[in-house]
Amino acid sequence: MSSPTLHTFTVAADKAGQRVDLFVGDVLKLSRARLKRLFEAGAVKVNGRAAKKGLLVATGQQVAVELEEETREAVPDEDFPLVVLHEDAALLFVDKPAGRPSHPLQSGETGTVANALVARFPECAQASVDPREGGLCHRLDVETSGVLVAARTRAAWTAVRAAFGERAVDKRYLALVTGPLADEGDIDVPLRHHPRHPDRVEPAPQGAEDAREAVSRFRVLERAGEYSLVEVRIFTGVLHQVRAHLAGIGAPIVGDTLYGGREAPGLGRFFLHARALGLSHPETKRPMHVTSPLPPELRAELERLGLRAPGQRPEPASAG
């Protein structure tokens, strides 16, 4: 690590009332894990005094942050059981297990999909702008399982990232929910980080500067009593989008207690699986469609409830 750099900011009127950890995270673009370490080390001061992360900032206050620049390096992890769904000269589609992060949030961290990619495919470290991302073109929540795409070259990574930004990637999820739910529908509700709960998002008030567009489409595949197995296609890629959108229409995901979902102690996770990805290959331009099999614990939960697990290839949905 290099010597710390002092960053100072004055709280503007439109940021008054925001938690100081969210304020710092927004202006410096830091992960929650790194913010936690900064506050534990007393590296964040408000008007010269060490601040706790829950402090609400006021207009005109001076916020100072001592920040060490972290070394960005890819750490190979050969012990991670990487499952490759598809491999070619440009792309890798891998099956992420629940409980594993997509990529590291701090220097030296291992145990993530990105670490496993770099161990098996070293060229992935140079494909993404940040070598710690191991060529990954997107990410999934820690407790979400399913298909991820990574690039083996910078050109492929740039092309696939652009496709995500242009909504040219077909992203399908399977979720088990409870609550009344129409057979199908669209959810077009912008989201933002919750101002007092940094580990979740919420519907953004109209006109909010930090609002991010979020559009999802759902279709019920099976029902059993109050349970519904739903396929969700997302057209944007906001943090926790599927979880927050389904909870927002009164159908939270089973096991997702952060968003009001019913507890599922026997499951050990929430029921959300990235079922399929479809995109145009960056080199051949041919359409690709890669699916991830439903994990055994999710299949067992469906069987317990008398629901049928769907086939691996989802039916096409209109882009609308």
What are these regions (language model features)?
Residues M1-G320:
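RNA pseudouridine synthases
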